Curated annotation (Swiss-Prot):
Its main location: cytoplasm. This is ATP phosphoribosyltransferase. It comes from Rhodopseudomonas palustris (strain HaA2). It is an enzyme of class 2 (transferase). Feedback inhibited by histidine. One of its GO terms (biological process) is L-histidine biosynthetic process. HAMAP family: HisG_Long (MF_00079). It is found in: Cytoplasm. Catalyzes the condensation of ATP and 5-phosphoribose 1-diphosphate to form N'-(5'-phosphoribosyl)-ATP (PR-ATP). Has a crucial role in the pathway because the rate of histidine biosynthesis seems to be controlled primarily by regulation of HisG enzymatic activity.
Length: 325
């Protein structure tokens, strides 16, 4: 029996809910035949897919090992835990949830420290005065080392943090921190501020592929189907379908509509009877409808699109190119 295609998704909380909703919108409903507490699942209509419910950090580790084909996890975890991440995994697509920034934060009382260059000066002075290096509390050890090296900050040492990193300066276990934040409210509540150029990484949940997984022909075909579904849903979300028919509908009018409203005519120009189907950005719907009526249309209908399939599959092309490298 051919080994299954393994998709790893978060096992709890909002990340799990958002991941399941994302796949459901693409027509890829995840289910747990063994019940809510089961850590294995399936996708309706894809018999050779096994869904593995794991923590976000476990997903990153399994992508690195090649024991899953696709995984949903944050870019911050990939960059932190996988050496040479761009060679070993592919960020296929950002999923639009799980947004957070990895940042350098210092006490608000450091009024003269606003940039990494200022921090370099302060760390150098701190070592000269105290005969020890300034401490940085973080769980992002590799990201911190890389970012500080880019800014030529060397007089520091990392204090590994297991949790509640933002409290480290207040309790005296570190002078500053590198941590992940969404709004910055928790940092501010702990008397910290983000440096002006201290955003190390703008992260979100991504659909990620592993280079080291077993990419058999059957598995690649499954990946193509999954990515085709996702791409068709993304394409559909950008447009509404507009339909009309009137005698004055011609190629010149269509060209003007393309230029003014950013429409796409997926089935070509108007038919001999003046029938026209357009895909229009939602923000331009009223303007387009008014334009068509001004030029003779009696009725213009607008409908939502569920999926728009195209001969091109840009997400799968991206994956195929990555696996060829």
């Amino acid at each position: 029996m051919t080994a299954p295609f393994v998709l790893a998704v978060p096992s709890k909380g909002r990340l799990q809910e958002n991941a399941e909703a994302f796949f459901a919108r693409a027509g890829l409903a995840l289910s747990k035949p063994g019940g809510a507490r089961d850590y294995r699942g399936t996708i309706a209509g894809l018999d050779n897919v096994e869904v593995a419910y794991l923590s976000a950090s476990e997903i990153a580790a399994n992508l690195a090992r090649g024991s899953v084909h696709f995984g949903v996890t944050g870019e911050d975890l990939l960059r932190e835990s996988i050496a040479d991440a761009d060679r070993r995994v592919l960020l296929i697509d950002g999923l639009g949830f799980g947004y957070a920034n990895v940042v350098v934060a210092v006490p608000q009382a450091w009024i003269d420290v606003r940039t990494m260059a200022d921090l370099d000066d302060v760390t150098t002075g701190f070592r000269a005065q105290h005969n020890r290096r300034m401490r940085v509390a973080t769980k992002y050890i590799n990201l911190t080392r890389g970012f500080f090296a880019q800014h030529n900050v060397v007089d520091y040492r990392i204090v590994e943090s297991a949790g509640a990193t933002e409290g480290a300066p207040a309790v005296g276990t570190a002078e500053m921190i590198v941590d992940i934040t969404t709004t910055g409210a928790t940092l501010a509540a702990n008397g910290l501020k983000v440096l002006d150029d201290g955003i190390m990484l703008r992260s979100q949940a991504n659909l990620v592929a592993s280079r080291d997984a077993d990419w058999s022909d059957e598995v690649r075909e499954t990946a193509r189907v999954i990515l085709d579904q996702i791409a068709s849903r993304a394409r559909a979300s950008k447009y509404k379908e507009v339909r009309t028919r009137f005698a004055g509908c011609n190629e010149a009018l269509l060209a003007e509509a393309h230029k003014r409203f950013g429409v796409v005519s997926p089935f070509g120009g108007p038919t001999s009877s003046g029938m026209l189907t357009l895909h229009c950005p939602p923000a331009q719907i009223y303007g387009l409808g008014s334009f068509l009526r001004e030029h003779g249309a009696d009725t213009v209908s607008v409908a939502s699109l569920d999926y728009v399939f195209d001969k091109d599959n840009p997400l799968f092309s991206k994956l195929a190119a990555f696996l060829r490298q």
